[in-house]
Amino acid sequence: MAHPHLLAERISRLSSSLEKGLYERSHAIRLCLLAALSGESVFLLGPPGIAKSLIARRLKFAFQNARAFEYLMTRFSTPEEVFGPLSIQALKDEGRYERLTSGYLPEAEIVFLDEIWKAGPAILNTLLTAINERQFRNGAHVEKIPMRLLVAASNELPEADSSLEALYDRMLIRLWLDKVQDKANFRSMLTSQQDENDNPVPDALQVTDEEYERWQKEIGEITLPDHVFELIFMLRLQLDKLPDAPYVSDRRWKKAIRLLQASAFFSGRSAVAPVDLILLKDCLWYDAQSLNLIQQQIDVLMTGHAWQQQGMLTRLGAIVQRHLQLQQQQSDKTALTVIRLGGIFSRRQQYQLPVNVTASTLTLLLQKPLKLHDMEVVHISFERSALEQWLSKGGEIRGKLNGIGFAQKLNLEVDSAQHLVVRDVSLQGSTLALPGSSAEGLPGEIKQQLEELESDWRKQHALFSEQQKCLFIPGDWLGRIEASLQDVGAQIHQAQQC
């Protein structure tokens, strides 16, 4: 076997050659190439005139000496037009019912069948055997067929509960194509002088028969790690819970796993990685509604679980909660104690701030969070002058909740221990405390836990950075995963600054 990274580079260059002159069809070419290299079938859905047949023709050039067969189905198509005419000579001389298959589907490596759902039962039944077993019954004997890729196309989906569903289920990869959208690409397409039938692939990049056969065995040796299987099973369970989710047969799941193995193999890896699971978005949908649903569920899986994003956020939440508990315990020791002034004959007890409290704005921590003015509050900012006046003369006192917005009216009092206590509408109280010294930093317990969490985050990010070098995964999906990991990293960093 060639060095894995050299193989990945070769397949990337092969795909680039196949994509030349085809605009906004890179993803379709790459998945069709992956299907061809792993012996799977593809269904292309889209309106006429969007290069569906050209995609199939291009794939012929991925292989040395590959033969192609393409046919436009109609309601009147006969098996002879797809599988070859009957041999009159064999029937006449020997009484044998045998087809002349040269130039037809049974002898082609690349097959393109347009308007596939118009095929009659006789064609469909033979086609199912060809896809499932790679065999063709020709008269009294069974012939092995060399088909590596079947591309079926239509501008419509098969009718539900029809005889076509069995064939549709065999189409592992399903791609929904549309017209060229980008203005620059549209102009380039209009003005291109390239002959679409020219071979764009250098001989050195084409796949030989020996390589293809060897790769089929090596694809099967790619492992499925436990954590990747758990992600697949999580997706399956989630789909089973959704009433509008499409039915996915065990056969389709099994074939999809082989496609993931092929993705890993041709990306230079020895095991399936979470990033390969994005391919399932093109394997599990049935119609327009399920296409969106499948993409949403896989997006949740990739941005929330595949690299432990949600698990790390849950751990972070527990660490932050523990830090709050420690701060509240510390606030008992650092509760702000005001000084009682003399004047026993005064109608109102007067207080003043300690002499060491000199800041013009005071930020005081709540021993326990309270809901004040419809906000969960953990600290209050007071103007020192306003607090001093309230301690001396009483009246109304206002403070900024969590240090933001306008100062809000507060229910504040001094308790018997000469501590400031703020109360909510239900008169639940929370003692106000001076924040700890910034030099103290995070408690050792919290600091260690955050460092361990940051280390785990770095490992997950490094794994993703290594795995994302996958030709078959669109860049926008990789961008969303990167953003989800960066968000987790930012939240960890923010907690470390507290």
Curated annotation (Swiss-Prot):
GO MF terms held by the record: ATP binding; ATP hydrolysis activity
EC numbers on record: 3.6.1.-
Gene Ontology cellular component list: cytoplasm
Keywords, alphabetical: ATP-binding, Chaperone, Cytoplasm, Hydrolase, Nucleotide-binding
Catalytic activity: ATP + H2O = ADP + phosphate + H(+)
Signal peptide: none
A family per Pfam: bpMoxR
Top-level division of the source organism's lineage: Bacteria
Cited function: Component of the RavA-ViaA chaperone complex, which may act on the membrane to optimize the function of some of the respiratory chains. RavA functions as an ATPase.
Self-association and partners: Homohexamer. Interacts with ViaA.
Protein name: Regulatory ATPase RavA
